[in-house]
Amino acid sequence: MNIKSIKDLDLKPGNSVFIRCDFNVPLDEYGNITDDRRIREALPTIRYCLDNDCKIVLGSHLGRPKGFDEKYSLKPVAKRLHTLLKQDIIMAQDVVGEDAKAKFTKLQPGEILLLENLRFEPGETKNDEEFAKKLSQFGEFYVNDAFGVSHRAHASVEAITRFYDQDHKAAGFLLLKEIKYLYKILENPTRPFMAIVGGSKVSGKLGALINLLPKVDKLIIGGAMAFTFLKALGYEVGKSLVEDDLIEEAKNILNQAKNNGVKLYLPVDFVVAPELDPNAPVKYVTFQEIPKTWMGLDIGPASTRLFKEALDEVQTIIWNGPMGVFEIDKFARGSIKLANFVAESFATKIIGGGDTASLISKAGVVDEMTFISTGGGASLELLEGKELPGIKALEVGAS
């Protein structure tokens, strides 16, 4: 994968740079940002352009608006950027309209213009070339620092790159870091290499499991997806979530792991309840004792001990997907315990974005991880071995 870094660009004072960021941050009901990690991760690239005395234009989406909708405005992001960078952020009232153009014309070196939510324009998600061309007029240089949307062929990620030659487009520091940890480690991990795969559905992680199997030495399968595997082994799992149409696939994965000499671990006990409810009664049972009308909602203490032993001597860990319904405290213990055990490991620890990143934050072990991806869907597609359109568009030789 041959991709230009922002450091390879010949940036001169006064040059304009359009940076595609990923400011898709969670907001509470009052429009306050509840987690600004994605904004903070974009700062090194923005600061690099400031140090080079460039005129900076930032573009991002937020949520999935259908046309203009004030609650998806990037104004809270402008406010947070102002706090973090300690400088004024010029906020455009539109994306490629009169206000954005007028403000861009007046932009001075060292100033930052933030465009309004890119998805207010229907052309963004359609990868529309006309819209991409309008966006490209906001920068002599184009930098993609939005790993979280690089798996989508959208106008600000893919089509826009057609308007820049090889010397005028590059990856920002965050995108390069994501590629380094997720892509390069998969290619050449320090062994023993373990993958921890959780979450609710096998269907969502099937591609990743198939791609990881030939690469890993150990594999932990947890979360609700474990029940499809237990059923494939002939066990009854009560009312737990099972994808019956994937039982054959689960059998294939179990056989392939055996043939490849991969040590595969499944939970041996669960926290079960009659329904998914914070007030439901719970009990701990082994995997052979799940009552007919109850469902497993977290892994039990014997499973966390087993997984802790499995972590012994491992040198590289990739984790994607929680072990239970960690959003509800009584079903979060297994995931949090495992997060603590992973934190104590001396291995290189890479966390896929999305739910797993939220879990690591809830467990309070963010600083103990080597790298936490900012993209849930994008990191999963890399684990599946797929090419991401936004990264492919930056490869030297791509037109």
UniProtKB/Swiss-Prot annotation:
It is found in: Cytoplasm. Keywords: ATP-binding, Cytoplasm, Glycolysis, Kinase, Nucleotide-binding, Transferase. InterPro entries: Phosphoglycerate_kinase, Phosphoglycerate_kinase_N, Phosphoglycerate_kinase_sf. Gene3D superfamilies: Phosphoglycerate kinase, N-terminal domain (3.40.50.1260). It is an enzyme of class 2 (transferase). One of its GO terms (biological process) is glycolytic process. GO terms for cellular component: cytosol. Its main location: cytoplasm. Its EC number is 2.7.2.3. ATP binds at K205, G296, E327, G353, G354, D355, T356. Pathway: Carbohydrate degradation; glycolysis; pyruvate from D-glyceraldehyde 3-phosphate: step 2/5. The keyword NAD does not apply. It catalyses: (2R)-3-phosphoglycerate + ATP = (2R)-3-phospho-glyceroyl phosphate + ADP. GO terms for molecular function: ADP binding; ATP binding; phosphoglycerate kinase activity. Monomer. This is Phosphoglycerate kinase. It comes from Nitratiruptor sp. (strain SB155-2). The lineage of its organism: Bacteria, Pseudomonadati, Campylobacterota, Epsilonproteobacteria, Nautiliales. The gene is pgk.
